[in-house]
C-alpha cells in the first residue's frame, strides 16, 4: 500500500481508543499503548515540527482513557514510560548523549530484554524515506508515517523483538545535530555497530524488503500493515561455529575475520585490528606497566596478566583436570596439561618436524634453527634463546635460591635441581623404571633415567657431534669449545665450566662432607665418592673367590688375595720369558 509523502501533524500519528476499547486492554497492552504514543511524540519532537502539542496533552489523553490520577502527572508519566523503556529496551533516553553515558549498562539490559521479552500483538505500517546519503538537516528529512496499534484478537501478529533499540536509531540519528559527532563515534565504537548500517537495515524492514521471514502465530488480516520484523533464529559463524543471537550481528561479526589491521605500531611496524591491542603492544616498547599488584608491588603491562599473577598470592586454582584432578591457576595451563593425557602435540616445527605440547616450547625450539637469542643478561651481556634460561642465569649473579627442599631445608636455584635432590630422601616415588626398578618422584626424571638403558642421546653437539643424555650435559660440554667458565669461586677466584664442579670445589673451603655412609658413618664431599665406597658394603660378605679354590669371607681379604695372585702371575710370566730367551 503506497503512502503519501509529506509533512504531518501529531494527529496523524495519534492512536485513539474508545472508553470501551480501553477497558478491554490488559496492563501490558496499556503499557504498550503509552510506549508507542510517547515514541511517536518524541519522533516528531526531534524533527522540530510546529504542530506538536505539549506533553501535558498526551497526559490528558491518558486520563481520558481511565488512567489513575498518579499517571496523570506529567513528571510521573514521563518517568513511568521512560524508565519502563529503559528497563525493557536498554535505552535511558532518546537523547544520544544520555544513551552514550549509560552505555555500561547497555549490554546487560539488552540480554535481559531478549530473554524476558514476550510476544506482543502489533500491527504497524511505517514507511521511511530518509536515505543515508542525505544531509542531516531538517529540510531533507521527510517521513510518511502512520502508525496504528490494534490489540484485537482477530487481527494481530506475534513477533520476537530481536533488536529492542532498532526503532530508536532513527531518533538517535536525528539528534546528531544536538549531540555532536563525537558522541556518535563513541556510540558506534562502544556497541561495535554502525548507525548508518543499522538505519539502512531498518529502512529495509519498514519498506517491506523481506530480509527475514516472518514467523506468525496467527496471521494478520491486514497483512500489508505488518512490518517484516526479524524472527529469533540462530546465526552461526561459519569459521568458528559461534552462535550469534542477533541476525544483524552475524554480518558484523563476520567482518572480524577479514578486518583490516589498520592500527600500526610506529616502532616495529606490527599491525592490529583493534586500537586496544595496539595500546597493549606499545607498552612493550615503552616499558610502561600501569597494573600493579597490591601485595608485592610487581607491575604488569596488561590487566589480565595482573589477574593471573594475583592467584599466586591467593592460591586460587579454579581450573581442574577431569582426568587426574590436578588444579591449575590458568585455563591455558590446564589445556597444556590435558595434552599430556591425550598425547596431542599440535605445535610442529617446520624445519625438523618436531612437535610440542605448548606454543612457547615451539618458539624456543625454533631459535635453535635460527640462532636467535633475544634474552640478554644486563650483568654479563650473555644472551639466551629462552626467557626461562635467562631467569635461571640471573640467579648466578643474585645468589637467589627459591626452590627449597621440605625434608632438609636445602635450597636450589632451579626446580630441576630440587627434583633431583628429592630423590635422595625416602618417600613416595610413583614413577618406577621397568628395567632396574629405580623409582623417581617425577616422570621427567624417569624419562632421563631410561635413556641410560636405551642408549638414547638426543642432545648433540654442533661442533664435534658428541651426544648426551641430558641437555645440561650438552651445555657443559659446549663450554669446552668456547672456553667459557661462568661459575667462579668467591673464595679463591677459581672458575669452572659447570656448576656442579664449583659446588664440589666449595666444599674444600667449607670442609663440608654431606654424603654419609649409612653402614659405617664415613662421610664424603662428593656423591660419586660415596657411591664408590658403598660398593665395599654391597659386596656379599660370604662371597667366594675361586681363583685357587680359596674361600674368602671378607672383602679386605679378597683384595689382598687378588694382589698376591696378580704378583704370582707376573713372576711366572717373567720366568717363562727368561727360559724362552735362553733357548734361542
From Swiss-Prot:
Keywords: DNA-binding, Metal-binding, Nucleus, Repeat, Transcription, Transcription regulation, Zinc, Zinc-finger. SUPFAM superfamilies: beta-beta-alpha zinc fingers, KRAB domain (Kruppel-associated box). Pfam families: KRAB, zf-C2H2. It comes from the Eukaryota. Residues 8-90 form the KRAB domain. A zinc finger (C2H2-type) spans 263-285, 291-313, 319-341, 347-369, 375-397, 403-425, 431-453, 459-481, 487-509, 515-537. GO terms for molecular function: DNA-binding transcription factor activity, RNA polymerase II-specific; RNA polymerase II cis-regulatory region sequence-specific DNA binding; zinc ion binding. PROSITE patterns: KRAB, ZINC_FINGER_C2H2_1, ZINC_FINGER_C2H2_2. Disulfide bonds: none annotated. GO terms for biological process: regulation of transcription by RNA polymerase II. The keyword Acetylation does not apply. It is found in: Nucleus. GO terms for cellular component: nucleus. Its main location: nucleus. The keyword Repeat applies. May be involved in transcriptional regulation. PANTHER family: IP01015P-RELATED (PTHR24377). Belongs to the krueppel C2H2-type zinc-finger protein family. This is Zinc finger protein 677. It comes from Homo sapiens. The gene is ZNF677.
Amino acid at each position: 500500500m503506497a503512502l503519501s509523502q509529506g509533512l504531518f501533524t501529531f494527529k496523524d500519528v495519534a492512536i485513539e481508543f474508545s472508553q470501551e476499547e480501553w477497558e478491554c486492554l490488559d496492563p501490558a497492552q496499556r503499557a504498550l499503548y503509552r510506549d508507542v504514543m510517547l515514541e511517536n511524540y518524541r519522533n516528531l519532537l526531534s524533527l522540530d515540527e510546529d504542530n506538536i502539542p505539549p506533553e501535558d496533552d498526551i497526559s490528558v489523553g491518558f486520563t481520558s482513557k481511565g488512567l489513575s490520577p498518579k499517571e496523570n502527572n506529567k513528571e510521573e508519566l514521563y518517568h513511568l514510560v521512560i524508565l519502563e523503556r529503559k528497563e525493557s529496551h536498554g535505552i535511558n533516553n532518546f537523547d544520544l548523549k544520555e544513551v552514550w553515558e549509560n552505555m555500561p549498562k547497555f549490554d546487560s539490559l539488552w540480554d535481559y530484554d531478549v530473554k524476558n521479552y514476550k510476544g506482543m500483538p502489533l500491527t504497524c505500517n511505517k514507511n521511511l524515506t530518509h536515505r543515508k546519503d542525505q544531509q542531516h538537516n531538517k529540510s531533507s528529512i521527510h517521513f510518511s508515517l502512520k502508525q496504528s496499534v490494534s490489540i484485537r484478537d482477530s487481527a494481530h501478529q506475534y513477533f520476537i523483538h530481536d533488536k529492542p533499540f532498532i526503532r530508536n536509531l532513527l531518533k538517535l540519528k536525528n539528534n546528531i545535530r544536538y549531540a555532536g559527532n563525537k558522541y556518535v563515534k563513541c556510540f558506534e565504537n562502544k556497541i561495535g555497530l554502525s548507525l548508518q548500517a543499522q538505519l539502512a537495515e531498518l529502512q529495509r524492514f519498514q519498506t517491506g524488503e523481506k530480509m527475514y521471514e516472518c514467523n506468525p502465530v496467527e496471521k494478520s488480516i491486514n497483512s500489508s500493515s505488518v512490518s517484516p520484523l526479524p524472527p529469533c533464529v540462530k546465526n552461526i559463524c561459519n569459521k568458528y561455529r559461534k552462535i550469534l543471537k542477533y541476525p544483524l550481528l552475524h554480518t558484523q561479526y563476520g567482518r572480524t575475520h577479514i578486518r583490516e589491521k589498520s592500527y600500526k605500531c610506529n616502532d616495529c611496524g606490527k599491525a592490529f585490528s583493534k586500537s586496544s591491542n595496539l595500546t597493549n603492544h606499545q607498552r612493550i616498547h615503552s616499558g610502561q606497566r600501569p597494573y600493579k599488584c597490591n601485595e608485592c608491588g610487581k607491575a604488569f603491562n596488561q590487566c589480565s596478566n595482573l589477574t593471573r599473577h594475583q592467584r599466586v598470592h591467593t592460591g586460587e586454582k579454579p581450573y581442574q583436570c577431569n582426568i587426574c584432578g590436578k588444579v591449575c591457576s590458568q585455563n591455558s595451563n590446564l589445556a597444556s596439561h590435558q595434552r599430556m593425557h591425550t598425547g596431542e602435540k599440535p605445535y610442529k616445527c617446520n624445519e625438523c618436524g618436531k612437535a610440542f605440547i605448548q606454543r612457547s616450547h615451539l618458539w624456543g625450539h625454533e631459535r635453535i634453527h635460527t640462532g636467535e637469542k633475544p634474552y640478554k643478561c644486563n650483568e654479563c651481556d650473555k644472551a639466551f634463546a629462552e626467557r626461562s634460561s635467562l631467569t635461571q642465569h640471573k640467579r648466578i649473579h643474585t645468589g637467589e635460591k627459591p626452590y627449597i627442599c621440605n625434608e632438609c631445608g636445602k635450597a636450589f636455584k632451579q626446580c630441576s635441581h630440587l627434583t633431583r635432590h628429592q630423590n635422595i630422601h625416602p618417600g613416595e616415588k610413583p614413577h618406577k623404571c621397568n628395567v632396574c626398578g629405580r623409582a623417581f618422584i617425577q616422570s621427567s626424571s624417569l624419562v632421563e633415567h631410561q635413556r641410560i638403558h636405551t642408549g638414547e642421546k638426543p642432545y648433540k653437539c654442533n661442533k664435534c657431534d658428541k651426544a648426551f643424555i641430558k641437555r645440561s650435559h650438552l651445555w657443559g660440554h659446549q663450554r669446552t669449545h668456547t672456553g667459557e667458565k661462568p661459575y667462579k669461586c668467591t673464595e679463591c677466584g677459581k672458575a669452572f665450566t659447570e656448576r656442579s664442579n664449583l659446588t664440589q670445589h666449595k666444599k674444600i673451603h667449607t670442609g663440608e662432607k654431606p654424603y654419609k655412609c649409612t653402614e659405617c658413618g664415613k662421610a664424603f664431599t662428593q656423591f660419586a665418592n660415596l657411591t664408590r665406597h658403598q660398593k665395599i658394603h654391597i659386596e656379599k660378605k660370604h662371597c667366594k673367590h675361586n681363583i685357587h679354590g680359596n674361600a674368602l669371607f671378607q672383602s679386605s681379604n679378597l683384595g689382598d688375595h687378588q694382589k698376591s695372585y696378580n704378583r704370582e702371575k707376573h713372576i711366572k710370566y717373567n720366568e717363562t720369558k727368561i727360559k724362552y730367551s735362553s733357548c734361542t
